[in-house]
Design a protein with these regions (language model features):
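Terminal alpha-helical segments
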Residues: 1-150
Length: 150
């Protein structure tokens, strides 16, 4: 499967990006990471901590996809597709995507269905994954789409 196959399946659309958009997305991910660290220091709930860390992951994944010239089509499964698309950037072997998908599902339960189900270990793990994904995405963009990053 390729990004173009995803376009044919109507999961993605081609859309150019530029360094301003990528810088904005990476700054947004950085902001969510700062908020995550503040939530940890302030002892906010593990649900809130995981939600902020997950947002940093999702935004970083969006930056990778946008740097490649694609965006997820609106209308359902946007977060799922954004995470799965990391296969075409930082995770071609799909080593971390299953973990990120579990975190996505955990975040969804905490956001939409129930509260207090996130453990400290899960929140901490999500925070570590967020830092990792953010760094790997920036490194990947610098290597593969240097014209899209300052």
């Amino acid at each position: 499967m390729s990004l173009e196959n995803w376009v044919k399946n109507s999961w993605l659309e081609r859309r150019d990006s530029d360094e301003v958009e990528i810088a904005r997305l990476l700054a947004l991910a950085d902001g969510r990471l700062k908020d995550y660290h503040r939530a940890v220091a302030g002892k906010l709930s593990f649900d809130v901590q995981l939600g902020l860390a997950y947002d940093a992951i999702r935004i970083s994944a969006t930056a990778a996809l946008r740097a490649a010239g694609y965006r997820v089509v609106r209308g359902g499964s946007e977060h799922y597709r954004t995470i799965e698309a990391l296969e075409f950037s930082i995770d071609p072997q799909k080593k971390i995507i299953p973990t990120l998908d579990k975190l996505r599902r955990k975040r969804n339960v905490g956001s939409y269905d129930d509260y207090g189900l996130v453990s400290q270990g899960e929140a901490d793990h999500c925070g570590k994954m967020a830092v990792r994904v953010r760094k790997e995405v920036e490194d990947w963009i610098r290597k593969n789409h240097a014209d899209k990053i300052v």
